[in-house]
């Protein structure tokens, strides 16, 4: 309490003077002109170093330690502590508004404990990235909110962390989960831009190359096979026993000249290589100063980026230090690098925040929402009216407590049909769903059984659609807005939690990026002789849903589960919407 009063008094003095306050409860500010701090380490400062903003002072120091072991240099360090006047978002705004493309660093690292102003972070991060910057960030404290109980599939899957994930994707920020990963991603940013996903691994030791190839493949990058006359020619220039299939293993007795030859072939002769990763430690068979000099020259000459993995930081400490002193970074662990690189390459570019209005009747959406009497779950007819206003195709259905009317409808749409109870929200929990009803007697039996269940006011009948089940949902997060989720339905969403997140409103680019980042995407595309689904229509529905949400902030939770992809197109079969007014 006393500390809070002193903090407020300090802020009042600063505001009266028209000054800026960083902190309190922080290690302060360091840059090329000033590092009057009481902590260690103080890194080297260079104009082309990294700008680093941290919520925590202690963590900032540990991140600097991790960066220094890689040869990463700094341009400025900001520790915002309690953020009484300026938080991480405010420092980013300052950097964006005063950005000088010639003088300022283009690499930003963020360690964030709380996102108080998501809109500000989104706006200035994406603005800086569009100006040519690259941003990597850790958002700490990502699991606590996930423990909250929630009533829908969407609520159970979408924690506050999904909002962070969606925000970072929309802004184009590379999300990291540890100090080591953050400083590895920032080190990747210092190298030449990666133009593709095809990686060549050049090594003199088999094991690390295999582990690196595994890490790259898991991260959806390619380690293409190198074969044919060009590969044979390269093999003829190396010692017997060398392998060139990728990894290119020049073996333990390989010389600096062999390394140079392998790099030249990857740069000039192999068209299916976009970047090179060179693993070279100290087997004690060649002079490492000579080898690292070759690597230094090739990194300057080559147009394709080269990632140096020099693992012998103890045995070859002086040689590695000498290499780093020439302005290079070093990745001592190949798997950390492979994982970090996949994060960089799989992070989309900043997305448009324009709203796609096509196909959504916004006045009708508002009329429906404004007419609703209060908070809670909407009844099936209200849900259908709202989805119709957003032009989301619905399965034909009929709800009634009149047995004969239900039988007539089932006859019209043709068996098999599905019957569901009207009333309770969680129908399947009370046995209120019957699938694959093949005839009149079966439907009558289910009608009699279901009408006796507690809280049931009627029965809904739908044709039984055949096709791939998809899932679509949304959840409102304070300050962030609506997080939209998409994925394959059934086991994929419930057990495997294979979902993608986006922040409404969604552009088509962002929506396609969400769909294609799903682990189950090959099923959407069509795999093993099975026909794919209409990806364009799925994207249309997701975009329209995000527009609907943008104009109906009262919707706090919703899911369409399943959305069935049939030969005739996609249809929403079951949907739930909860509003708060």
PLM feature spans:
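Catalytic-core regions of core metabolic enzymes
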Residues: 1-581
């Amino acid at each position: 309490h006393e500390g809070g009063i002193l903090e407020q008094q300090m802020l009042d003095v600063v505001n009266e003077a028209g000054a800026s306050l960083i902190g309190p409860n922080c290690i302060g500010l360091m840059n090329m002109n000033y590092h009057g701090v009481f902590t260690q380490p103080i890194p080297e400062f260079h104009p082309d170093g990294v700008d680093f903003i941290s919520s925590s002072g202690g963590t900032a120091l540990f991140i600097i330690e991790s960066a220094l072991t890689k040869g990463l240099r700094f341009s400025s360090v900001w520790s915002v502590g309690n953020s009484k006047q300026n938080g991480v978002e405010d420092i980013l705004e300052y950097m964006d508004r005063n950005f000088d493309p010639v003088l300022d660093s283009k690499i930003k690292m963020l360690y964030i404990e709380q996102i108080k102003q998501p809109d500000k972070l989104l706006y200035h991060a994406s603005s800086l990235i569009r100006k040519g910057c690259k941003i990597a960030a850790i958002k700490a404290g990502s699991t606590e909110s996930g423990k909250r109980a929630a009533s829908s599939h969407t609520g159970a899957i979408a924690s506050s962390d999904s909002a962070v994930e969606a925000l970072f994707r929309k802004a184009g920020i590379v999300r990291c989960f540890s100090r080591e990963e953050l400083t590895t991603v920032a080190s990747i940013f210092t190298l030449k831009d990666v133009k593709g996903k095809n990686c060549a691994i050049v090594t003199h030791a088999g094991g690390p190359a295999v582990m690196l190839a595994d890490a790259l493949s898991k991260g959806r990058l390619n380690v293409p096979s190198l074969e044919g006359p060009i590969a044979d020619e390269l093999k003829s220039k190396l010692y017997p026993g060398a392998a060139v299939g990728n990894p290119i293993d020049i073996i333990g007795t390989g010389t600096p000249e062999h390394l140079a030859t392998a790099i030249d072939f990857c740069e000039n002769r192999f068209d299916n290589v976009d970047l090179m990763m060179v693993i070279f430690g100290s087997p004690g068979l060649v002079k490492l100063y000579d080898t690292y000099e070759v690597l230094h020259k090739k990194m300057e000459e080559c147009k394709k980026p080269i990632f140096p993995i020099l693992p012998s930081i103890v045995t070859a400490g002086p040689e590695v230090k000498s290499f780093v002193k020439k302005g290079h970074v070093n990745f001592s662990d190949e798997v950390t690098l492979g994982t970090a690189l996949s994060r960089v390459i799989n992070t989309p570019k900043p997305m448009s925040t324009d709203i796609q209005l096509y196909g959504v009747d916004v006045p009708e959406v508002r009329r429906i929402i404004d007419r609703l009497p209060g908070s809670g779950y909407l009844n099936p007819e209200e849900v259908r009216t709202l989805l119709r206003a957003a032009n989301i195709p619905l399965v034909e259905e009929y709800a009634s407590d009149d047995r004969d009317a239900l039988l007539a409808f089932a006859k019209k749409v043709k068996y098999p049909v599905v019957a569901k109870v009207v009333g309770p929200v969680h129908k399947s929990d009370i046995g209120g769903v019957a699938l694959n009803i093949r005839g009149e007697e079966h439907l009558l039996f289910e009608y009699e059984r279901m009408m006796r269940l507690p809280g049931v006011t009627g029965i809904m009948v739908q044709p039984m659609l055949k096709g791939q089940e998809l899932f679509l949902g949304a959840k409102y997060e304070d300050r962030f807005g609506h997080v939209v989720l998409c994925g394959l339905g059934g086991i994929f969403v419930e057990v495997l939690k294979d979902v993608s997140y986006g922040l409404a409103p969604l552009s088509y680019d962002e929506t396609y990026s969400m769909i294609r980042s799903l682990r189950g995407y090959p099923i959407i595309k069509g795999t093993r002789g099975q026909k794919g689904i209409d990806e364009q229509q799925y994207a249309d529905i997701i975009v329209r849903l995000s527009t609907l949400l943008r104009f109906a902030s009262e919707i706090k939770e919703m899911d369409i589960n399943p959305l069935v992809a049939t030969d005739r197109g996609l249809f929403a079969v079951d949907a739930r919407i909860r509003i708060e007014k």
